[in-house]
Swiss-Prot record:
The keyword ATP-binding does not apply. GO terms for biological process: rejection of self pollen; signal transduction. This is Defensin-like protein a. Disulfide bonds join C33-C81, C43-C67, C51-C76, C65-C78. Belongs to the DEFL family. Keywords: Disulfide bond, Secreted, Self-incompatibility, Signal. Involved in self-incompatibility. It comes from Arabidopsis lyrata. It is found in: Secreted. Pfam families: SCRL. Expressed specifically in anthers. It comes from the Eukaryota. One of its GO terms (cellular component) is extracellular region.
Length: 86
């Protein structure tokens, strides 16, 4: 009986330890998903594509861009997911 109890307790402790280590691995990675910028001009025609071109010039590769006209300038917000380690 003692042997089976010891086995069950050991199993529970090992399971908790493994799940804790996996949780710590997930926290090592960060994700940046928004890319924003202000540019001169208005959002005319296909402003979303213009935003994508403007933000691509910085070496990024954004997707799903949104153009809004604010304070006399084009405000671009794009999704740009990049995963990097700490």
């Amino acid at each position: 009986m003692r042997c089976s109890v010891l086995f069950v307790v050991s199993y529970v402790i090992m399971s908790l330890l493994i799940s804790h280590v996996q949780g710590m691995e997930d926290q090592k990675w960060k994700k940046v998903c928004n890319l924003e910028g202000n540019f001169p001009g208005r959002c005319v025609g296909n402003g979303d594509e213009q935003c994508k071109r403007d933000l691509t010039e910085d070496g990024n590769n954004p997707s799903k861009c949104r153009c809004r006209f604010r304070a006399g300038r084009r405000h671009c917000r794009c999704i740009y997911c990049e995963v990097f380690g700490m």
